[in-house]
C-alpha cells in the first residue's frame, strides 16, 4: 500500500560515488535533498579496486575538487598509499593514484552525508518514478513510500537489474552480495528511454596471512606524497605497501583448458564489458602469445587482511579460480576470501542525455555514473557533481553549468558520452583530450575554481587563495625573464653535470630553466634573490616556462573550438527534411540534437560535408 512519505526538491537514487556528489552538490546549493541507497552500509562503497585516481582519473579527482566536490577531500582523509604515475613522461599525463582504506573511505563519506545540512540519507529501493505532465514529480520505494520531488538524479551504479555470474552460477544480485535494484530499469524503458546492458567484473580477494610477499616485488609509495585536494594542508602519509607478481604459462594453461566453462565464451554473458579493464580469461584469449601478465596485490585497508588482486578479474568457476591462483608466485597457498565474479547491469544510452546530463525526453530526470555507460569511481563522481549542480540550477531558475571539452576532462568525458555515445563501459584516458597540456592536474584549480566559485561551492577565501597563487606564479616568471646569471665555474660545472652546454658571458634564468635537462630547483644556488615559494608555485612556474610554446598553440586551438561551440543550432531545427544532408547524418543529428555546430561535428556519422550544409542553413536562416 502506497503512502505519502514527504516532499523534497531533489531525490538522488544511489549513494555510490556519483550519488554522493550529486546529493552534496544539491544540498550545498540550498535545495532540500534526499539520497536513497539500497543499503546504508554501502555508501561510498568500492566494490572493485580499493583506490582513487590513476591515469586520467587523477585529473578528474583534482577537477572535481576545484569545482567544489568531495571525493578528493575524502580520499586525503582515508588513503594509505600515494603514487604519482607517469613521472617519466611530460606533466600533461602525470596522474595521482592512491590506495584507499576502503571502509574508512565509506565511513567518512557516510558521515559527510549524515551531517550535511538540507540532506537526508535513507535506506530504500526506488522501484519507479511518477511523472506529471511528462516531468518527474515523485519517486516510489519498494515498500510503497511516495516522495514528492521536483527533480531526480539516477546514480544506480551496477545495481540496476543486476546479475552476478561465476562459472555456471548466475543470480540476481548487486555488487558485494547486495540486493539488485528491481523495477526501475523496466519502467524507464517503458517511458521511452533506450536502455542497454553492460558488464564489469572484479578479482578475488585473498587473506594477507596466507600469501608470501617475499616472492613478490615491493611497490612502495612516493617518498614525498602529495594530496588530491587543493585544500589539504597536511602532507599525506604512506601507511601501506603494495606488491607485484605475475601470471605464468601454468596459469594460462589452466585458463585455456577451461575456456568452455567461461561465461564470457560459452554464451552465458552476452553484454559488453570494459575494453581497458579486461578479465584474465579475455587477456589470455586476446594475447595468446604473451607469457605473463602483471598482478598487483593491494591491501583493502589497514584493519583487514583482505588483499585485492588487481589484474585477475574473472568470471571463471570458483574451482578454476583456485587452481590458477595456486600457480602464481606468492599466491601458491593463498586463501580466497571472496571469489571473482562478473556483474551485468542496466544502463541508459547516454545520447539520451543533454550536456547537462538531463534526459531529453523526461524533464527533471538526470543520469550519472555507470547508469550513463561509464566505468570507474572517478568518472561517476564527476558526472554526479554535474548532474546535481544542474538539477539545482534548474530548480533555482538559473542558467545551467555546461562543462566543455576545452574546460577539462570532466567536460571531455560528458561530451564523449552524450555526443558520441558508447557501446562499452567508458573509461577516461589522457589521450581522449585534445588539449591535455592545458588540462594538467596541477592547474585544475586555475581552470575550474572560477566556475565552482560562481555556483557557490567554492568559498571566497578558497577562490582568493587560488588567485594569489597564480599571481605569485606570474610574478616569478616575470622576475626570471628579467634576471641574468653570470658565467662561473660553479654554474658551468652544474650544467655539464646535467649534460647541457655551459654558458659564455651570462644567461637569463628563464632561458636556463627552459633547457630540458634543468629544473627550477637546479638553479637555486645561482639565484640569490629567489623568493621562498611553495612547491606548487615552483612547479607551475617551471611547467609554464618549459612548455610555453606548446601551451600557446593549444590555447589557439581552444579559441577555434570556442568559435565552433558559439555557433548554436536551434532546438526546433528539422534535420530529417534538410536538403543536402546524407541520410545517416540526418538520422544522427535528429537523434542527438546537438546544441552547437561544434558538437555536431563530433557526432559519429556526421561528415565535414554535412557540417558545411549546416553552416549554409544557419546563414540562410539568420533571424
Could you say what each language-model-derived stretch is?
Residues 39, 186-322, 419-492, 496-506, ...:
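An anion/pyrophosphate-binding glycine-rich loop and adjacent beta-alpha core
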Residues 4-18:
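Beta1/beta-strand and adjacent pyrophosphate-binding region of the FAD-binding site
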Residues 130-146:
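Conserved beta-strand-loop-beta-strand element in the redox core of flavoprotein oxidoreductases
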Residues 6-7, 24-128, 143, 151, ...:
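Conserved N-terminal/central alpha/beta ligand/cofactor-binding core
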Residues 380-401:
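Internal hydrophobic alpha-helix adjacent to the cofactor/substrate pocket in enzyme cavities
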Residues 370-378, 434-436:
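Glycine-rich phosphate/pyrophosphate-binding beta-alpha loops
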Residues 308-374, 402-415, 534-588, 593:
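A glycine-rich dinucleotide-binding beta-alpha-beta segment and adjacent secondary-structure elements
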Residues 432, 449-610, 616-623:
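Extended, charge-enriched "interface" segments that sit outside catalytic cores
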Amino acid at each position: 500500500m502506497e503512502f505519502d512519505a514527504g516532499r523534497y526538491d531533489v531525490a538522488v537514487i544511489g549513494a555510490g560515488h556519483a550519488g554522493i556528489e550529486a546529493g552534496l552538490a544539491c544540498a550545498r546549493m540550498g535545495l532540500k535533498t534526499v539520497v536513497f541507497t539500497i543499503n546504508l552500509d554501502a555508501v561510498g562503497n568500492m566494490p572493485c579496486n580499493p583506490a582513487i585516481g590513476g591515469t586520467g582519473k587523477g585529473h578528474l579527482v583534482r577537477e572535481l575538487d576545484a569545482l567544489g566536490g568531495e571525493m578528493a577531500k575524502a580520499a586525503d582523509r582515508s588513503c594509505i598509499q600515494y603514487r604519482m604515475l607517469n613521472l617519466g613522461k611530460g606533466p600533461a599525463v602525470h596522474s595521482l593514484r592512491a590506495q584507499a582504506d576502503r571502509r574508512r573511505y565509506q565511513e567518512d563519506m557516510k558521515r559527510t552525508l549524515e551531517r550535511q545540512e538540507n540532506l537526508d540519507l535513507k535506506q530504500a529501493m526506488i522501484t519507479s518514478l511518477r511523472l506529471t505532465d511528462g516531468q518527474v514529480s515523485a519517486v516510489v520505494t519498494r515498500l510503497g513510500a511516495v516522495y514528492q520531488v521536483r527533480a531526480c538524479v539516477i546514480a544506480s551504479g551496477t545495481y540496476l537489474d543486476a546479475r552476478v555470474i561465476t562459472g555456471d552460477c548466475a543470480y540476481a544480485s548487486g555488487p558485494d552480495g547486495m540486493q539488485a535494484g528491481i523495477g526501475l530499469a523496466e519502467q524507464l524503458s517503458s517511458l521511452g528511454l533506450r536502455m542497454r546492458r553492460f558488464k564489469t567484473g572484479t578479482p578475488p580477494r585473498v587473506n594477507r596471512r596466507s600469501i608470501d610477499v617475499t616472492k613478490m616485488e615491493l611497490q612502495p609509495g612516493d617518498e614525498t606524497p602529495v594530496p588530491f585536494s587543493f585544500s589539504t594542508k597536511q602532507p599525506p602519509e604512506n601507511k601501506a605497501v603494495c606488491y607485484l607478481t605475475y601470471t605464468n604459462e601454468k596459469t594460462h594453461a589452466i585458463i585455456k583448458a577451461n575456456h568452455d566453462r567461461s561465461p564470457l565464451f560459452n554464451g552465458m554473458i552476452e553484454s559488453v564489458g570494459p575494453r581497458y579493464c579486461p578479465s584474465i580469461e579475455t587477456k589470455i584469449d586476446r594475447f595468446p602469445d604473451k607469457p605473463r601478465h602483471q598482478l598487483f596485490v593491494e591491501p583493502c585497508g589497514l584493519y583487514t587482511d583482505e588483499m585485492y588482486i588487481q589484474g585477475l578479474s574473472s568470471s571463471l568457476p570458483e574451482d578454476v579460480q583456485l587452481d590458477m591462483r595456486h600457480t602464481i608466485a606468492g599466491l601458491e597457498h593463498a586463501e580466497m576470501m571472496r571469489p571473482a565474479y562478473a556483474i551485468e547491469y542496466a544502463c541508459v544510452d547516454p545520447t539520451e542525455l543533454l550536456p547537462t546530463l538531463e534526459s531529453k525526453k523526461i524533464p527533471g530526470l538526470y543520469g550519472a555514473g555507470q547508469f550513463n555507460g561509464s566505468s570507474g569511481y572517478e568518472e561517476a563522481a564527476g558526472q554526479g557533481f554535474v548532474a546535481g549542480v544542474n538539477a539545482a540550477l534548474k530548480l533555482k531558475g538559473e542558467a545551467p553549468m555546461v562543462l566543455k571539452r576545452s574546460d577539462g576532462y570532466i567536460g571531455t568525458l560528458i561530451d564523449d558520452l552524450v555526443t558520441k555515445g558508447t557501446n562499452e563501459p567508458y573509461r577516461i584516458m589522457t589521450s581522449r583530450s585534445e588539449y591535455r597540456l592545458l588540462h594538467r592536474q596541477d592547474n585544475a584549480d586555475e581552470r575550474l575554481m572560477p566556475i565552482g566559485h560562481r555556483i557557490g561551492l567554492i568559498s571566497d577565501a578558497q577562490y582568493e587563495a587560488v588567485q594569489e597563487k597564480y599571481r605569485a606564479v606570474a610574478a616569478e616568471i616575470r622576475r626570471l625573464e628579467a634576471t641574468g646569471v653570470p658565467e662561473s665555474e660553479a654554474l658551468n660545472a652544474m650544467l655539464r653535470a646535467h649534460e647541457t652546454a655551459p654558458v659564455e658571458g651570462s644567461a637569463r634564468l628563464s632561458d636556463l630553466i627552459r633547457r630540458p635537462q634543468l629544473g627550477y630547483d637546479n638553479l637555486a644556488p645561482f639565484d640569490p634573490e629567489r623568493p621562498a615559494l611553495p612547491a606548487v608555485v615552483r612547479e607551475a612556474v617551471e611547467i609554464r616556462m618549459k612548455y610555453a610554446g606548446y601551451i600557446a598553440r593549444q590555447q589557439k586551438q581552444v579559441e577555434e573550438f570556442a568559435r565552433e561551440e558559439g555557433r548554436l543550432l536551434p532546438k526546433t531545427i528539422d534535420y530529417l527534411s534538410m536538403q543536402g544532408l546524407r541520410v545517416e547524418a540526418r538520422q544522427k543529428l535528429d537523434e542527438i540534437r546537438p546544441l552547437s555546430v561544434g558538437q555536431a561535428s563530433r557526432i559519429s556519422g556526421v561528415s565535414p560535408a554535412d557540417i558545411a550544409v549546416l553552416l549554409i542553413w544557419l546563414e540562410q536562416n539568420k533571424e
